[in-house]
From Swiss-Prot:
Catalytic activity of the protein: tRNA(Val) + L-valine + ATP = L-valyl-tRNA(Val) + AMP + diphosphate
Biased composition (Basic and acidic residues): 120-129
Species of provenance: Leifsonia xyli subsp. xyli (strain CTCB07)
Protein name in the entry: Valine--tRNA ligase
Sample GO molecular function, one term: valine-tRNA ligase activity
The keyword Aminoacyl-tRNA synthetase is annotated on this UniProt entry: yes
Region (Disordered): 110-130
Membership in a protein family: Belongs to the class-I aminoacyl-tRNA synthetase family. ValS type 2 subfamily.
GO cellular component, one term: cytosol
Coiled-coil stretches noted in the UniProt entry, renumbered to this chain: none
Function of the molecule: Catalyzes the attachment of valine to tRNA(Val). As ValRS can inadvertently accommodate and process structurally similar amino acids such as threonine, to avoid such errors, it has a 'posttransfer' editing activity that hydrolyzes mischarged Thr-tRNA(Val) in a tRNA-dependent manner.
Motif placement: 'HIGH' region: 47-57
Amino acid sequence: MPEKPALEGLEGKWGSRWQEDGTYLFDRAAAIAAGRDAVYSIDTPPPTASGSLHIGHVFSYTHTDVVARFQRMLGKRVFYPMGWDDNGLPTERRVQNYYGVRCDPTLPYEPGLTPPFEGGDNKSSKAADQKPISRRNFIELCERLTVEDEKQFEALWRSLGLSVDWSQTYRTIGEESLRTSQLAFLRNVKRGEAYQALAPTLWDITFRTAVAQAELEDRDQPSAYHRVAFHGEAGPVFIETTRPELLPACVALVAHPDDERYQPLLGTTVRTPVFGVEVPVVAHHLAQPDKGSGIAMICTFGDITDVTWWRELDLPNRAIIGFDGRIVSDAPEAIDTEAGREAYAQLAGKTVFSAKQTVVELLRASGDLVGEPKPIQHPVKFFEKGDKPLEIVSTRQWYVKNGARDEELRERLIELGRGIDWHPDFMRVRYENWVNGLTGDWLISRQRFFGVPIPVWYPLDAGGNPVFDAPILPLEESLPIDPSSAAAPGYTEQQRGQAGGFVGEHDVMDTWMTSSLTPQLAGGWHRDDELFAAVSPYDLRPQGQDIIRTWLFSTLLRSQLEDGVAPWTHAALSGFIVDPDRKKMSKSKGNVVTPADVLERHGSDAVRYWAASSRLGTDAAFDPQNPTQIKIGRRLAIKLLNAAKFILGFDAPASLDLAQVTVPLDRSMLQQLTDVITDATAALDAYDHARALETTETFFWTFCDDYLELVKERAYGEASTGQVSAVVALRMALSAFLRLFAPVLPFAAEEAWRWWNEGSVHLAAWPAAAETSVGGNDARAVLNVLGRALTGIRGAKTAAKASQRTPVDSAVIAGPAGDLAVIESAADDLRSVGRIVELRFTAGADLAVADIVLTQAPEEER
């Protein structure tokens, strides 16, 4: 036991010891032998291994670790793995920026490639500034950088004190993850749950890839309404649009069927301005009479509503935007006039922004622009990781059915969600709203490089064209496989790309196709059947509320499609971290705080205290300039060490027994501690770590401020039943407090526990009420009454501007007879702590210090 306990250095000291001792290892054989009920399994969220963690990660992962430590102390065999989400766009972008490269699949592999910014910090993300390299070279760089990032992440998690079993890790780009992802996909295909379709697709022009509904976010953007005249037999028809550049792609005008203004036009045709194409006027219930002029143009494609109208009204496709976000060179066939084609030629090859400016000038010149554009701000769809608005292009993609167009599947997903215990419960409604609001099946193919290859080939017909309706699937035992480098079953590599041969699928899976299988990846699905049976269904899925629509929903979907069983029994959802202005912290807003410096400056226990002080689903403010809660947590951890050192300074009997606690004050403290144990246990059972911490902390300060002060003179005294009673009560309380705080303050609790115990506090049994319960409802009152009397004595000294160590010649305490009787039973303790020579009592309505006479210091001391 050190002379002066300190928090500094505890993370390294105990982190190393836990690793050496295997404190948190999951014993697979013992767990299988004990059965599923003896295991507590956690579907840990794999953080994206691309860059740095932020304070929000520390916040939510601490919540999970508190649960893991609590369950371990309850005697459960805790399966607490860690994964790294290291495939997908975030990794690709980081590699591009870090090494100054970009992937060009047409280039050959270059052995021993040295990227231009090897080990540097390239700030540019412009393709023009990056060296093009082959796909294989690019993937090698992705592998290299993610491994380094993961080492840094693990070091930070260890310093935070996560009780993860570091032998149970996986990477979403690792070989087993590839195999599992491809196996699950093949089964989706064979059951008809995964399919291909040529359809309008949300497209990010920067990354040149399709994007799923779950990856969208709205961002307010400046725009303008342009009032434009179409020409009909009865005269002009005015529409208002924010996208005049799509006039060449217009296929119809649409109005609400009940809008009397336009009912006479329904079934007629009008001519588009500038381009001179005849288009029909149609009716649809999604048209908004109160928006703009009440009649809108349908283009292929300006937004999702255009896609709905196009599909449901069976309209032609006249798409004009290419994969690069520029206007394609060939005009739609419907533009058949010389003037129309000349106008279109002015747009070809331009960006959407430039094309818009050109069309506005053409409209102004033709007289079809009415007035000037009216500036507005409106929400525009972006890929959540993208920088430019999404476009909609027609592409062939792979999809997985998700209930958007299958009512039976949608209802099964809703019921599956209702079978899970949500913490907090209102998060279930968000899940159901997402399921009910889906507009299309899950688009799972991505036109990227670093991801799980879609394990499919296509036969080529006599003309060398892919036969997409007859995909070639690999044997399950051949997985994992990359169709871009492995020949299709029944073919040789020489037949690749040849008529009558085959071509490999070049797309990769959406990263969520792998992340949606985290229970299977960690638990050994179709790799270790005994382990999977021991941990599945998992007890807990912890995560952030912002990825309900992605990670949580997709995991439920994959489980429903695979076996119809919910993958976990509990879902715990953390709130957001907000800045002092209550704005959500995010990388895009530039207000993210990285945790390494915070942990270094304040210590891990203090940061964990801040995180654990917030309930699930509740946002927490973080001010790096004045982290008040973290400072409170540090003070608490130091107090725990100091209290332990103080208590352990008293010699205690070799064995502790409740029967040795005979003094009413001591018994009162233990009975109140019993209530704390009961309440904290119930709170943690209900996934309310904040209430458990608050309950424990509140009584701990009462224990330190009142009880310790009241009994220390007796504990210091000569051996007697009263002295033994105090010391035994103190030791019992310390044992309970260290275990109660252990899930939140693991380093301080371990340090103090090891001063007088063998083994780790984190493998000790969670405190039980029976350990400290002395029985009797009256026992609780003694400490409360003595505490109030002590507060009165302290208050009187403070009012007299005297030190708390100032002796008291005499004090009179007034109060009800019952309270006075309690105080008289512990009068010696009160006299000692208050330094009171004479203590008298008198009847009164309320407990109070009626009179106090402080000892006057000698003249020379004044």
